[in-house]
């Protein structure tokens, strides 16, 4: 197959992190299967994909000019995609920009979804909520298929089940993992990697937990002092945005990595979080507060599960503390959890779905 992989206005710092790594792995594995793949990215600034097609637009201006610039960039990108003559287009869902709807005239489009976009944009602002509600069907409506990272999202995003859907949870390339040695901390160190403005990460919960147990260090990566409200205790370290090597350095000193702690705020209960998978492949025990699509039935001592509720962290604070102490000096047995996360198996499933979609269009 000749595949056009399309992303629209993903922030460069996101493309330098786990999302970019995920996209790079997709492209690498698809090419290993003999498919021709090119990434086409509409972006406000350069992203670390020098070998791919980037279409920059100036976002540092007033609203009208910015949207005009974005539309101009979108037209240039769609022209390039059309000239590429793909058999199929894999579009990572993003907020609609004119004239994105024309992408469906080029080739069958499979939409890659990653969250409940309706609730996500509701939390950003009334403007973005209604902009997304009024335009999202321009992307989903004509789509030839949808890929979802969870079964829960299928019911939310394709409620009528009127088009082909494939559930492919996020995974990892097991040929490219590195188990970090367990640190020799005097007291436990917990780490959460997130992005400011996303309340479902539950950073506020960890801060309250830190106040209860001042001997435990809490690393919060991605958040700076201006990104949190209220007092922050001395045992909470706000690292701000870090590049991938800097994140790895923080994780190297971590006893327990925290997954998203407040998915309920986004009306979600199931996920396959990239940061949880990254931590596991570094060998770091994890705290999970949601139903993991791959790991929900896996019972190992290095995974602690708590309910997906507003009071989950404080209600289970003692259990979390005990788990953190118990995990000091321990690492995850990747031979047990790895087979559930194998990206190569997942990409075989995704590519087979592409073939199914194309067969249905003939």
Regions found by a protein language model. Name each.
Residues 1-46, 208-213, 217:
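N-terminal subdomain of nucleotide-sugar transferases
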Residues 14-20, 197-201, 245-249, 259-281, ...:
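Nucleotide-sugar-dependent
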Residues 19-29, 173-176, 189-231, 238-248:
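Conserved catalytic-core segment of nucleotide-activated headgroup transferases in glycan assembly
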Residues 25, 74-79, 98, 111, ...:
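Membrane-proximal helix-turn-helix segments that form the acceptor-binding/catalytic region
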Residues 136-179:
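Donor nucleotide-sugar binding/catalytic pocket of nucleotide-sugar-dependent glycosyltransferases
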Residues 307-318, 324-359:
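A charged, aromatic-enriched C-terminal amphipathic alpha-helix characteristic of glycosyltransferases
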């Amino acid at each position: 197959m000749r595949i056009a992989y399309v992303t629209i206005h993903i922030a460069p710092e996101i493309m330098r992190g786990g999302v970019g790594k995920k996209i790079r792995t997709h492209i690498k594995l698809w090419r290993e299967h003999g498919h021709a793949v090119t990434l086409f990215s509409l972006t406000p600034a350069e992203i670390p994909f020098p070998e791919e097609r980037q279409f920059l637009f100036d976002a540092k201006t007033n609203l009208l000019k910015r949207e005009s610039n974005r539309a101009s960039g979108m037209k240039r990108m769609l022209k390039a995609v059309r000239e590429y003559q793909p058999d199929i287009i894999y579009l990572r869902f993003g907020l609609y920009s004119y004239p994105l709807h024309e992408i469906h005239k080029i080739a069958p489009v499979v939409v890659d979804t990653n969250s409940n976009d309706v609730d996500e944009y509701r939390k950003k602002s009334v403007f973005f909520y209604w902009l997304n509600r009024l335009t999202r069907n321009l992307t989903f409506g004509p789509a030839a298929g949808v890929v979802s990272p969870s079964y829960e999202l299928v019911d939310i995003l394709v409620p009528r089940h009127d088009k082909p859907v494939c559930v492919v949870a996020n995974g990892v390339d097991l040929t490219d993992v590195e188990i970090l040695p367990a640190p020799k901390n005097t007291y436990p160190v917990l780490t959460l990697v997130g992005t400011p403005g996303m309340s479902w990460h539950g950073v506020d919960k960890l801060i309250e937990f830190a106040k209860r147990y001042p001997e435990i260090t809490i690393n919060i990566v991605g958040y700076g002092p201006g990104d949190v409200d209220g007092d922050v205790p001395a045992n909470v370290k706000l690292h701000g945005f870090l590049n991938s090597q800097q994140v790895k350095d923080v994780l190297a000193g971590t006893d327990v990595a925290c997954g998203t702690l407040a998915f309920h705020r986004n009306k979600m209960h199931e996920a396959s979080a990239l940061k949880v998978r990254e931590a596991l492949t570094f060998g770091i025990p994890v705290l999970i507060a949601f139903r993991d699509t791959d790991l929900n039935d896996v019972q190992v001592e290095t995974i602690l599960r708590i309910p997906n509720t507003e009071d989950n962290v404080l209600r289970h604070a003692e259990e979390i503390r005990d788990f953190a102490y118990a995990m000091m000096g321990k690492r995850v047995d990747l031979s047990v959890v790895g087979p559930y996360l194998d990206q190569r198996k997942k990409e075989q499933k995704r590519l087979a779905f592409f073939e199914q979609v194309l067969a249905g269009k003939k």
